[in-house]
Design a protein with these regions (language model features):
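Short amphipathic alpha-helical interaction segments
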Residues: 33-44, 106-121
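Short acidic, hydrophobic short linear motifs in intrinsically disordered regions
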Residues: 19-31, 94-105
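A generic structural signal for beta-strand entry/edge sites
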Residues: 21, 57-59, 133-135
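Long, low-complexity, charge-rich intrinsically disordered regions
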Residues: 1-16, 62-66, 73-88, 92, ...
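Long, low-complexity, charged/polar intrinsically disordered regions in eukaryotic proteins
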Residues: 1, 25, 29-71
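Residue-level recognition of short, well-ordered coil/turn positions
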Residues: 21, 50, 93-94, 124
Length: 177
């Protein structure tokens, strides 16, 4: 392979990671370079401390300037249900019940329950108890939105276009009033 072809790939790998955190497979896909080539450049950048990596369920690559909490946030949002819960609660002006989240996100009750549990453990959401149900809301919207801007800039930029109009989940709670 010519040096001319290697250079763009090498620079692209670094640029993508410094721009925002990413997973290894997403990086390979976005750079459109061979897996082995990306791996080679990653090892060079990690050795130089130009980038960092965190291995877990996914191999996350990120800028050394990002705080650990932002990386945890990114990892958490790799789960589509957790991401959906967080986005719906960020957008909502009201605290929502689990039933409302199930109706809005169209995921199963156990999936929503698991996502809520993880978000509660991280203290990114808080639970409000009302007999016979609980509602959930974001603990610190400003802080979470700042982390969203660092990890998912496209979502943060287009956040105002995200609409919660459908379905109207409030009908599920009318029986308790």
């Amino acid at each position: 392979m010519s040096k001319q072809m290697q250079t763009p790939c090498k620079e692209l790998v670094l640029d993508k990671i410094l721009e925002k955190p990413t997973t290894f497979m997403k990086l390979v896909s976005e750079c459109q370079c061979a897996t082995e080539t990306v791996e080679k450049y990653l090892s060079i950048y990690i050795e130089k401390n130009s980038i960092k990596q965190k291995k877990g369920k996914f191999r996350v690559l990120y800028s050394p300037e990002l705080e650990e909490e932002v990386i945890e946030f990114y990892e958490l949002l790799l789960n589509p249900t957790t991401k959906a819960i967080l986005l719906v609660l960020l957008k909502s002006n009201l605290a929502l019940s689990q039933i409302e989240l199930v109706a809005t996100i169209e995921k199963s009750n156990p999936s929503i329950s698991r996502g809520l549990k993880v978000l509660l453990e991280k203290r990114w959401i808080k639970r409000n108890y009302h007999a016979p149900f609980s509602t959930y809301q974001i603990s610190n919207k400003t802080k979470l939105f700042e982390m969203l801007e660092k990890t998912y800039p496209k979502i943060a930029t287009n956040f105002e276009q995200f609409d919660l109009c459908y379905p109207k989940p409030r009908i599920f709670l009318d029986i308790y009033q």
